[in-house]
């Protein structure tokens, strides 16, 4: 397959580029925390555009293959982490912070699932929730209250406010209508 692609390498790289780009767009929409994959993709494309000799083309193709493989693995990460959906993993990624204990990580996983469930249930009750200040405030308060009640004590006031904002922005972009 690689050798066949190398003969028509320009076309093959363009095809692979298009597939990776589409996959990245879906993944970033589902989980904005995956931006590092997009950054890696841009590095590969920039290197390819800088110099197009045969060695660069071969390296670019191999880099794109490797990136595509890691994207496939990332798309299955929610299963490895014990979640039932990529959405739950997205909330977890937004709440995750370095230096958490194993127990705190388990708590964050539970909070992620619980918070997403509560948000979806609340949004389902609200008519065009993103259109009115009152309904936006209901969702924002739900996020704030859940984080205050359920996050580990290692999260301070500043952390909770930061995570509240991140989760709200994610929900606002991801669930403009009934979830």
Where are these regions (language model features)?
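Single conserved hydrophobic/aromatic residue that forms the stacking wall/gate
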Residues: 1-8, 12
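C-terminal amphipathic alpha-helical interaction region
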Residues: 17, 30-179
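Short, charge/polar-rich alpha-helical segments
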Residues: 23-27
């Amino acid at each position: 397959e690689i050798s066949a692609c190398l003969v028509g390498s320009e076309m093959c790289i363009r095809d692979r580029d298009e597939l990776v780009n589409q996959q990245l767009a879906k993944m970033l929409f589902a989980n904005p925390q995956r931006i590092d994959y997009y950054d890696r993709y841009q590095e590969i494309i920039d290197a390819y555009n800088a110099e197009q000799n045969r060695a660069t083309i071969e390296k670019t193709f191999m880099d794109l293959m490797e990136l595509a493989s890691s994207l496939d693995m990332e798309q299955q990460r929610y299963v490895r982490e014990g979640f039932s959906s990529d959405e739950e993993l997205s909330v977890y990624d937004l709440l995750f912070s370095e230096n958490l204990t194993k127990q705190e990580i388990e708590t964050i996983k539970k909070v992620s699932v619980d918070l997403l469930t509560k948000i979806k249930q609340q949004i389902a009750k609200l008519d065009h929730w993103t259109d009115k200040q009152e309904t936006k405030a209901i969702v924002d308060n739900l996020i704030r209250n859940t984080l205050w009640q359920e996050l580990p004590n290692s999260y301070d006031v500043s952390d909770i406010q930061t995570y509240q904002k991140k989760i709200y922005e994610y929900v606002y972009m991801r669930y403009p209508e009934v979830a």
